[in-house]
């Protein structure tokens, strides 16, 4: 068998990267390899079966780990990854490096000025020199390592002339025949077997997008790509002796089999990833599913929907709000099916979770809607994992025939509100003041700006007349929140009206501290706490006091919302004063605390354990005397006050009569 015949074998053009670096190339062989010009005689050639040699070399072919996705966690598209996720074949790094070293050795020999030695003698000297080295720390000669590796691979003696001459010609052999090689792989995709060409004329030609249409609907619906590699054929054009048919793919996966995206199967190996070539990732924006007020249009409230159901215009507005709550890498092409939108009166029944109740006051209501291309979402949800956005969006169901279509529950908000002043609260947050209605934040503004405002983008309807008392109540709520920022409303420079809406607020800077006035009314069984700042009453807290079962003191506020928006608490001095007031209240009732109570203005209710005071008769009498003295003193003060008031009133009446007499 002549070397010219050897030059035409190995169409293992499966050399996607002879010299594998971190980059991925489509060509199989390095065109910069140095090629020898020797034409060896037949006596210098090895005798080895072509088919056997083909198997040895093909066994060095493997998938390039740089062409595979290691962890199939993120959905990718063709723009994101380019060639990164398309599996490409190459020679193993060790084989590639060995061929490169032989190429360099050939070049070094051919450039020698003195050609007294043959290549065999030149290479043999290098081998023997390395064997004679007495020091392990001396650097290894990579050229010699390459000779040993290749001779061991083919199972031949590296010191024989035929062996070294064969190794010398290997770069020529590989480079001369790769252009005639084809590799096809039998794969299973979408439940069907397909034969796909991976290598053609020396190049990797396989693209994932080429077989994407073979995926089944379920896989497309979740952007999940699964390819099972079963067997391969190695074909050299017009060289049937080098052809290998129905070969196992195990050698292709030697260096990548431990990747999370690769799994060993009964019949081969499976590569899994999240990919769709046209995937257009949609992310949720901050303001979710908010229906804007449209000028010169009939805007709708939650009441309008509850009374009359959804009409086509309202469905269009909801569709617009859902779509524009998302942003995408490319153009926002989220396809919301307007015709499928339904008003959901009781959403908690659908998802078995606690949600904010629909309310005309804060504009919250719920709808279900189909997204035709839901597989473009970053998360599409399932029955076991329905939450897409907490409280805002939940998976309901997936279309069985078209899995990319999914139905979701959406929490919508309309900006047409119908409310009372009592529903509105404020809370400071950094430099902003948040507007809260029915425990839901719906707006915010900067109170440090002159003529600032809130509800600007809302259409607000007040259930009752916006009276002066309502205005004062709203200002008190504003001041309660503003005081945390050392601000108060400047009434002279501010205007505040909700119907018709006219809000222009200006604030004053203050540096005053809080002052607390505490009182326990033993007759009304009430605790009263008044909080003042800068000579203004900031707020008043009223608590009902009750003794239950003679072992429990209950204190409950009459305003269930106020405590949520109090930013301050009693200082140590006032806390002790309150404890003393409560102790006095209990002592009058002949009770005492079991242990020292702790009190906070930020809680709505308290429960303290108490004991009945056990006293001797003499102590009871002393206590009774004290109580009688307190009551007697209170009656005396009341009598004196009435007397003084009556005296002043009587004197005033006499003056009026005298003046009238003089006029006549």
UniProtKB/Swiss-Prot annotation:
GO CC terms: plasma membrane
Name this protein carries in UniProt: Uncharacterized protein MG415
Membership in a protein family: Belongs to the MG414/MG415 family.
Transmembrane segments: 625-645
UniProt source species: Mycoplasma genitalium (strain ATCC 33530 / DSM 19775 / NCTC 10195 / G37)
Residues making up the signal peptide according to the UniProt record: 1-25
Chief subcellular location: membrane
Keywords: Cell membrane, Membrane, Signal, Transmembrane, Transmembrane helix
Localization (cell): Cell membrane
Membrane topology category: Single-pass membrane protein
């Amino acid at each position: 068998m002549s070397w010219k015949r050897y030059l035409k074998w190995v169409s293992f053009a499966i050399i996607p990267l002879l010299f594998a670096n971190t980059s991925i190339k489509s060509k199989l062989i390095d065109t910069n390899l140095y090629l020898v010009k020797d034409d060896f005689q037949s006596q210098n050639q090895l005798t080895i079966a072509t088919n056997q040699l083909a198997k040895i070399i093909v066994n060095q072919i493997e998938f390039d780990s740089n062409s595979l996705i290691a962890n199939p966690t993120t959905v990718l598209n063709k723009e994101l990854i380019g060639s990164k996720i398309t599996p490409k074949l190459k020679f193993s790094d060790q084989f590639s490096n060995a061929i490169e070293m032989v190429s360099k050795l050939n070049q070094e020999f051919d450039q020698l000025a003195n050609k007294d030695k043959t290549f065999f003698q030149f290479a043999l000297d290098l081998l023997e020199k390395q064997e004679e080295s007495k020091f392990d720390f001396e650097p290894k000669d990579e050229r010699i390592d390459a000779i040993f590796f290749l001779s061991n691979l083919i199972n031949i003696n590296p010191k024989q002339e035929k062996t070294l001459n064969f190794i010398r010609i290997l770069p020529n052999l590989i480079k001369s025949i790769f252009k005639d090689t084809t590799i096809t792989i039998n794969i299973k995709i979408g439940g069907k077997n397909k034969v796909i060409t991976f290598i053609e004329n020396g190049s990797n030609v396989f693209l994932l997008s080429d077989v994407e249409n073979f995926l089944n609907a379920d896989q497309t619906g979740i952007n999940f790509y699964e390819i099972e590699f079963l067997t391969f054929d190695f074909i050299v054009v017009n060289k049937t002796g080098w052809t290998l048919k129905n070969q196992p793919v195990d050698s292709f996966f030697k260096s990548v089999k431990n990747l999370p995206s690769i799994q060993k199967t009964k019949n081969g190996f499976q590569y899994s990833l999240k990919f769709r070539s046209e995937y257009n990732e949609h992310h949720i924006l901050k303001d979710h599913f908010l229906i804007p007020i449209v000028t010169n249009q009939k805007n709708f409230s939650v009441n309008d929907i509850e009374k009359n159901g959804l009409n086509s215009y309202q469905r269009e507005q909801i569709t617009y709000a859902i779509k524009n709550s998302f942003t995408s890498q490319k153009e926002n092409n989220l396809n919301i099916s307007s015709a499928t939108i339904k008003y959901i009166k009781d959403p908690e029944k659908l998802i078995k979770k606690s949600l904010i109740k629909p309310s005309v006051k804060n504009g919250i209501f719920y709808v279900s809607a189909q997204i035709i291309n839901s597989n473009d979402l970053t998360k599409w949800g399932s029955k076991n994992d329905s939450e897409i956005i907490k409280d805002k969006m939940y998976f309901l169901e997936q279309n069985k025939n078209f899995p990319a279509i999914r139905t979701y529950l959406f929490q919508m908000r309309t900006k047409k509100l119908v409310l009372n002043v009592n529903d509105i609260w404020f809370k400071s947050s950094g430099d902003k003041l948040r507007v809260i209605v029915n425990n839901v934040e719906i707006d915010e503004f900067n109170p440090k700006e002159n003529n600032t405002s809130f509800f600007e983008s809302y259409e607000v309807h007040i259930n009752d007349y916006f009276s002066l008392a309502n205005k004062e109540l709203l200002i008190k709520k504003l001041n309660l929140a503003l005081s945390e920022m050392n601000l108060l409303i400047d009434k002279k420079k501010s205007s505040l009206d909700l119907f018709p809406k006219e809000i222009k607020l200006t604030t004053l800077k203050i540096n005053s501290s809080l002052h607390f006035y505490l009182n326990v009314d033993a007759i009304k069984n009430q605790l009263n706490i008044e909080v003042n700042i800068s000579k203004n009453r900031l707020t008043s807290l009223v608590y009902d006091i009750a003794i239950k079962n003679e072992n429990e003191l209950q204190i409950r506020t009459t305003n269930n919302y106020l405590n949520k928006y109090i930013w301050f608490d009693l200082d140590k001095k006032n806390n002790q004063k309150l404890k003393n007031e409560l102790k006095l209240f209990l002592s009058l009732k002949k009770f005492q605390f079991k242990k020292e109570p702790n009190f906070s203005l930020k809680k709505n209710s308290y429960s303290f354990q108490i004991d009945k005071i056990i006293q001797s008769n003499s102590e009871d009498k002393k206590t009774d005397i004290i109580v009688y003295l307190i009551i007697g003193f209170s009656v005396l003060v009341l009598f004196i006050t009435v007397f003084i008031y009556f005296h002043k009133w009587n004197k005033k009446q006499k003056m009026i009569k005298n003046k009238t007499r003089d006029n006549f």
